[in-house]
């Protein structure tokens, strides 16, 4: 089976999986556990998330979100992670480049039967124009196509 790690992908047998064996055959989103350490703004905050293949695992290089019922739900989760509001809320709890589970404490759960946009989230939570402008001045758009941040 494939294992996603910091130096690329590797392969191991299922018997070598030590933790969270029950997640191996589920739909999951992998989020890099370390983001850019840059102090410049606007900032990316998190590395690019991706949907892991069923039957895969990851090293501690990633934080796992899930399991989810379908690949479509995973893609909707990624649309949420991609929003500036999501990453702004993470930034409030992320004093270093490490993005471990605790940095997601301020991020509210959503209905992942649909994709999310910042405009929808700003309206849902009643953010003012000033609040939106502040968030957008602090958080860089996340482009999920190719390359690094």
How should each PLM-predicted stretch be described?
Residues 1-115, 120-126, 131-149:
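Polybasic, glycine- and aromatic-enriched phosphate-binding surface used to engage nucleic acids
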């Amino acid at each position: 089976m494939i294992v996603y790690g910091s130096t690329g992908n590797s392969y191991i047998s299922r018997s070598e999986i030590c933790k969270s064996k029950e997640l191996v055959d589920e739909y999951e989103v992998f989020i890099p556990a370390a983001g850019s350490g840059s102090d410049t703004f606007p900032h990316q905050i998190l590395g690019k998330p991706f949907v892991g293949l069923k039957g895969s695992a990851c090293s501690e290089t990633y934080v796992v979100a899930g399991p989810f019922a379908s690949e479509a739900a995973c893609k909707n989760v990624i649309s949420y992670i991609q929003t500036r509001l999501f990453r702004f809320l993470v930034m409030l709890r992320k004093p270093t480049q490490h993005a471990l589970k605790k940095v997601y404490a301020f991020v509210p759960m959503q209905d992942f039967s649909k994709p999310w946009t910042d405009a929808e989230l700003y309206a849902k939570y009643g953010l003012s124009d000033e609040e939106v402008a502040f968030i957008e001045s602090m958080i860089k758009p996340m482009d999920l196509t190719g390359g690094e941040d």
